[in-house]
């Protein structure tokens, strides 16, 4: 039985290393670079940039651009990534799928990850597509990832704060996440709980 919420509230959930047990971009790198001789070194560079950006050690936008430049991934790699991520959804979200579906209008995914791999994984557990806020890739004519949509607020430094502030959520807000960018929502007074 699903417990009824006592008040109107929103749950803002990060995707990478929260909704799933892994970092999507890091795993995409492992898939895309599988046959490359410098795979481990490049994947480690991407992981290091991910950690530095999440911890606020370097500007997020800089970390994102550097990671994308190292990827060399395409749409086929994204399909493989989605299949992999579907096996890596965190147990707590799998166990609480009924809650996710019952309160779908109040659950938001706010991620610096990418819609191309977040949407198919999150919607399978009841998250509404219109409640998924994430970056989007830019592709060339061959389907190779060549960048990110830099106009998307989540591709910018402080993107989560800017996005949630613009939402003007008039309710109790709980943030579920693992990184500094998630904590910033609480720090800036946009969340009641972190």
Residue ranges and their predicted role:
Residues 9, 130, 173-174, 192:
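Conserved acidic residues
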Residues 129-161:
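Glycine/Thr-rich beta-alpha phosphate-binding loop at enzyme active sites
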Residues 185-188:
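Hydrophobic residues within well-ordered alpha-helices
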Residues 2-136:
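Alpha-helical substrate-recognition element adjacent to the catalytic core
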Residues 115, 138-140, 181:
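Surface-exposed, flexible loop/turn segments at secondary-structure boundaries
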Residues 155-183:
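Conserved Lys-Pro-Asp/Glu-containing loop-to-beta segment of HAD-superfamily phosphomonoesterases
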